[in-house]
Amino acid sequence: MIVIQLLIAASLILWIRFLWSRRKLYMLMMQLPGRMGLPLLGNSVRYLIISRGRMSSRTTYMDKHGSTYMAWIGTTPIVITRDPKIAEKVLTSPFCINRSSQTTNALALSMGYGLLTLQGSKWMARRKHMNPAFKHSVLLSFLPIFNAETDLLVSVFDSFVGQGEKDVLSDLIRWSFAIATQTTLGTDVTKDDNFENDAILKTYQSMLRLTIINIFVPFVQNKIVSKLFGLEWLRRRDASAINKMINNILDKKLNSNPENYCESELKTVIHRAIELFRNDEMSLMELGAECSSMVLAAFETSAHTVYYALVLLAMFPEHQEMVFNEIKEHFPLAKGIEVTHTDLQQLVYLDRVLNETLRLMPSVPFSSRETLEDLRLSNGVVIPKGMTISIDIFNTQRNTDYWGSEAAQFNPENFLPEKIHDRHPYAFIPFSKGKRNCIGWRYGLMSSKLALVKILRNYKLKTSFPYENLEFVDHMVIKLAQSPQLAFERRTL
């Protein structure tokens, strides 16, 4: 009897200690709106199954309850906000340098520990080491690859002329994947059989799907649960295929003379990583993870950015004509275009269209951080240490308090210089911002803008899909519930 009483007392003490350790969390729950989730599952089931991951469900909730609220992903509480003031506080804070543990663990299962998944001082050291691979002169050396691969894409689109509306997203993904792999791993990657038959591309896409499951349903990160649902076998299969390809490339490069490569080849991510490996600043496993994660992060984001810009211009032909006239002024002839960085800098209206596309359809819809210390937000709310704060980029960039009553409408005039000057700097953060912004944002803009120049100089685009019917779905890269198809008409000038 005494033993039972002691066990009950001990259990009660542990339970009280547990509740006391979470007292700041419970205080936060009283300050912010939000609904309790299901045990173990949180709000994920409701969001993924009932709302089917529709971004509009978050928008509706914020419109009703305010720009900042609490949710539960599994057993993890998370603060979600679309307030630019809070976004600035979080993204510039030295106590919010780490991505959320939940997101990091999900990404690490897919791609190992590289720049996207490292935390704290390890991330800062790696970022410093990898910055030279993304400096301006290196990006300029990639222009021949951008031009060559976009010419191949244009030739594919040429076969679509007069054929009615076609799915173009899959071709854009192939284009972006070809660019991402060559600028990361070197141009010889295209000689791999798995590259030519799209096998490795499909493997990367499968890995992305598994990653989003691991983020939104975190209990499947457990290997036992993952095996039970058959996900562990898929993860190992995909990881094995990707590692095999990258290791084959690494073996060749590690055993070859650097003098055998041209200057642009030596500036790729893989050669920068090899340099760090030879200086004992990176392990062989980290080298492979860095290369894999760079490809994974780059190819779908650029493809979707170009796709969404083309879709919007097809839906709004008056803006498409303005872009075409600007491009035609710089490139009177459609054939044989070799786009330079100087050319890209002069296309001001195209810049506005691209920025407006990134505002309405940011490639990555959210950016999550974990607090290293208690953090007081601009609204006076204190976020406890160890809490995840997710910046809802999609809804931040459609926040009517900063973008006006027409925030959901396509309007490139939003990026006139005077309007940019008067707007909160964190109301537009398509590549995140602050201390841990996207290392490849200039790369993404340059490759996307160049592709738009060549496509729009050659073709007039049309679609029967109305703008009002676009429905956005949460994913690693923002997706559409139904993807509009495009019709191509060759420009005669």
UniProtKB/Swiss-Prot annotation:
Belongs to the cytochrome P450 family. Heme binds at residue 438. GO terms for molecular function: heme binding; iron ion binding; monooxygenase activity; oxidoreductase activity, acting on paired donors, with incorporation or reduction of molecular oxygen. The keyword Transport does not apply. Keywords: Endoplasmic reticulum, Heme, Iron, Membrane, Metal-binding, Microsome, Monooxygenase, Oxidoreductase. It is an enzyme of class 1 (oxidoreductase). This is Probable cytochrome P450 313a2. Its cofactor is heme. The keyword Metal-binding applies. Its EC number is 1.14.-.-.
